[in-house]
């Protein structure tokens, strides 16, 4: 799917990955008790911020990366029937390597 959002500067667009639906013992977690997801797949990346010298500083993540991000970071947006999250690069905590 192509994303119709083009992030600016050091922002990235993330598709949130679903949180675990059941516990290790097999109990189903109701929607009201689920934690906000903190993992997602990068679907678009801005060109990077401009530093004090006018140089473009690229973002450390790329499209397709799975990232961990701050629990309450970013702005939720809906486009094309899909819910996405627009984050600043500083809200990304790590890239998940599998």
UniProtKB/Swiss-Prot annotation:
<dbReference type="GO" id="GO:0044183">
    <property type="term" value="F:protein folding chaperone"/>
</dbReference>
<comment type="function">
    <text>Together with the chaperonin GroEL, plays an essential role in assisting protein folding. The GroEL-GroES system forms a nano-cage that allows encapsulation of the non-native substrate proteins and provides a physical environment optimized to promote and accelerate protein folding. GroES binds to the apical surface of the GroEL ring, thereby capping the opening of the GroEL channel.</text>
</comment>
<dbReference type="GO" id="GO:0051085">
    <property type="term" value="P:chaperone cofactor-dependent protein refolding"/>
</dbReference>
<keyword id="KW-0963">Cytoplasm</keyword>
<keyword id="KW-0143">Chaperone</keyword>
<dbReference type="InterPro" id="IPR018369">
    <property type="entry name" value="Chaprnonin_Cpn10_CS"/>
</dbReference>
<dbReference type="InterPro" id="IPR011032">
    <property type="entry name" value="GroES-like_sf"/>
</dbReference>
<dbReference type="GO" id="GO:0051087">
    <property type="term" value="F:protein-folding chaperone binding"/>
</dbReference>
<dbReference type="Pfam" id="PF00166">
    <property type="entry name" value="Cpn10"/>
</dbReference>
<dbReference type="GO" id="GO:0046872">
    <property type="term" value="F:metal ion binding"/>
</dbReference>
<comment type="similarity">
    <text>Belongs to the GroES chaperonin family.</text>
</comment>
<dbReference type="GO" id="GO:0051082">
    <property type="term" value="F:unfolded protein binding"/>
</dbReference>
<dbReference type="InterPro" id="IPR037124">
    <property type="entry name" value="Chaperonin_GroES_sf"/>
</dbReference>
<dbReference type="InterPro" id="IPR020818">
    <property type="entry name" value="Chaperonin_GroES"/>
</dbReference>
<comment type="subunit">
    <text>Heptamer of 7 subunits arranged in a ring. Interacts with the chaperonin GroEL.</text>
</comment>
<dbReference type="GO" id="GO:0005737">
    <property type="term" value="C:cytoplasm"/>
</dbReference>
<protein>
    <recommendedName>
        <fullName>Co-chaperonin GroES</fullName>
    </recommendedName>
</protein>
<dbReference type="GO" id="GO:0005524">
    <property type="term" value="F:ATP binding"/>
</dbReference>
